[in-house]
């Protein structure tokens, strides 16, 4: 989340089982307290279904079935869905698209746009080793993201192909 915010995302609202995470919410662990300080500046409260209304993007790293078609329908026009729970995503691509999603990505290899760490780690770590770096900083992560994005040409870019497949040549 910190990296996404550093790249310009503005209105980020994180949720957990109890709903929106915001500064001052009772019962937050130290990590969630830290995230509450840099996200949800309007201190929106409520369930995922309540705070997702009007959202452009959903990034899920939680549990199967967390996002419903009704929730997708309440999002902004042509929302982008990253449903990365594995092996069963927060919502399946066909369901998300039927509800109006423009782009859908999952952590599964049997659907287009698989988000898989195999796209990043070999090259990122090769660069870290070659540079004899002692840590992986945000600049390196951003460079890796741009390098991966650059593997899909403008001619190839479609809603079904925003990320290269792990086994693309």
Stretch-by-stretch model annotation:
Residues 1-59, 63:
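Glycine-rich phosphate/diphosphate-binding loop of Rossmann-like nucleotide-binding domains
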Residues 1-2, 36, 49, 56, ...:
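Predominant activation on well-ordered alpha-helical scaffold segments within soluble catalytic domains
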Residues 1-2, 22-23, 65-70, 89-91, ...:
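Short glycine/serine/threonine-rich phosphate/pyrophosphate-binding segments
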Residues 3, 38-48, 57, 61-65, ...:
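Hydrophobic alpha-helical scaffolding
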Residues 4-12, 75-78, 98-104:
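Secondary-structure transition/capping motifs at alpha-helix termini
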Residues 7, 15-17, 60-62, 75, ...:
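Generic beta-strand/beta-sheet core signal
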Residues 44-99, 132:
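Long hydrophobic segments that form regular secondary structure
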Residues 83-169:
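Adenosine-phosphate binding glycine-rich loop
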